[in-house]
């Protein structure tokens, strides 16, 4: 879920007025709509209906948690969109532990934390596109919500990241070295910070987090 609120004005979820001072969706406020979306960290697929309104079936989701994948895949596939059960990372084909807080299943992370452990398999986004014969040029919005693994996800995309016009990325530890590294990586790839969402405090680790919106220069 984007912390900027709904993407589509008619979504039944409250859009809110904190981020842009109105109750319109994100794309309305950007005066822009995507032709295709790559969404990493699907969870409950709340966004699938909104993406379908703008770009039909041309959206791809990744979900690392196999239980969430099975539970919510129909929410995505009903629109003809694709979903894959992999953990996006900077190395292919590793078996890694995914830590799942029992009371915050939407906060599952490859970074060690309290919670139940399930095993998941990694893939770089570049390899996913090669193996599935997907074309980066068909997607211009990247949405990343991976609870602390955002830098590794970006590294796994490589130079293909310049195909995206906008990147929405949740930064889960504001003020940290991690936040600095993510920002430096994106600016080195030709993006600039367009806007931050309102800040929130995590109920899992107590750290401040927000969504950041980057735009290709």
Which positions does each model-derived feature cover?
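Phosphate/nucleotide-binding beta-alpha loop and adjacent structural elements of enzyme active sites
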Residues: 1-217
